[in-house]
Amino acid sequence: DDERSFSAKSPLRRISIILAGAFMNFVLAIVILSTIFNIFGFATTSLDRIEAGTPAASAGLMPGDRITRVNGSKVFTNSDISVGVNMNKGKKIDLEYERGGLKDTVTIEPAYIEDEGRYMIGVYFKGEENPSILSSIKESFNETASLISQTFKGLKMIFTGEANLKTDVGGPVTIIKMSAGAAEVGVWNLMKLVAILSVSIAVFNLLPFPALDGGWAVILFIELITRRKVPDKIVGALNTVGFMLLIGVMILVTIKD
């Protein structure tokens, strides 16, 4: 083999090449999000206002409280709280918060708001209106971590049957519709969608499944540990089966769209 070819390189070198694509997806998302946050600001996880008579008010939450966990899952951004509230479909949730340096937990039963079409607890978050570049970059990492977490939770819901495949899963047609809608609202909304899709694609591509980068990485890790090359026939068969399954899923999702 040519010494410069991919197959001639060491397993560790090939792993770094395989994972470079996903890494660049994350970099793209962070650059876009940092720019958006620096221009428009962002919402924090600290409470600014609590609506009277809402589940949050009944639970004793107060302005200034900082939400840190929802049902034990770490909160990176305020969207984690909204997603956590709605993923439970109205079931009671445990909110961990910090007040004056002390942490406490309350149990809240979200209320379904007909006009909004979703569950809410009745809180408004403080905003960072003129963040510094460093604050914007830090928040972009938080947002990226949040998107990674939400993507994994979404995949888990699909595989466990918790997600509604008719309404919660979309394919190319859905993405095109979302892109068109975001573009109509404004270029920055479209860029935010690009960042979200970039992270989602990176996470999906890193799954340890044949034909995906994650599947290749697993094979190369096996070669690295055993110091033996996995036979090309086995690799080819795995990738063919994986590719066919992915194409099948894509066709089904597109038909559903």
Which role does the model predict for each range below?
Residues 1-49, 239-248:
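Internal alpha-helical transmembrane segments
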Residues 3-12, 110-203, 218-241:
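Functional transmembrane alpha-helices
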Residues 18-27, 192-206:
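Pore domain of cation channels
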Residues 21, 56, 64-67, 71, ...:
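Terminal peptide-recognition signature
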Residues 30, 34-69, 73-76, 130, ...:
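PDZ/PDZ-like domain segments forming the peptide/carboxylate-binding groove
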Residues 43, 168, 207-220:
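Juxtamembrane/interfacial segments flanking transmembrane helices
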Residues 58, 62, 68-69, 80-125:
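PDZ-domain C-terminal substructure recognizer with occasional recognition of PDZ-binding tails
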Residues 252-257:
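Juxtamembrane boundary at the C-terminal end of a transmembrane helix
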